């Protein structure tokens, strides 16, 4: 459901419908607070919307993890697919045989670009191995891999790469694209249609 239509949907709910959809309502508010905080503020002061919020505050809800996953992950996919991604924060690599057999070598210039917006990264940390998270939002799988630098200016994924490549069923010739989200402090696997600098990039 489009966020801009959500207030009308909520206002149209009758008592029975409201109770049936209470989980969706609370979770959608939580997602909006993350991705559309300004829009949520507008809804909070809307005369038609405010009574529903007042009622919502009095509801205690045990939200199942499955329901949260369904709504939260769907919204995440929409966000990364809809918004234009900064190309300077994308690492793209066509995988070679050696990448599949062992560790994956990463493009130097792209890694150095991403490093400018990584928090807590030091030269010593890169030399010893710096753990980063990689999120496949399509499957809601989260991987931890070690980003490491050798010979001063060569970068690769070490520990954790084996698990990630097998889980994603990667083979030689596949193009692996990762987007660094500096606000979430993790990489997003770009295995869905997305936009970069106004251009729609197919999977």
From Swiss-Prot:
Alphabetical keyword list: DNA-binding, Nucleus, Transcription, Transcription regulation
Name recorded for this polypeptide: Putative B3 domain-containing protein At1g50220
SUPFAM superfamilies documented for this protein: DNA-binding pseudobarrel domain
Disulphide connectivity of cysteines: none
Organism annotation: Arabidopsis thaliana (Mouse-ear cress)
InterPro entries on file: B3_DNA-bd, B3_domain, DNA-bd_pseudobarrel_sf
DNA-binding region: 99-195
Localization annotation: Nucleus
GO cellular component: nucleus
Domain of life, per lineage: Eukaryota
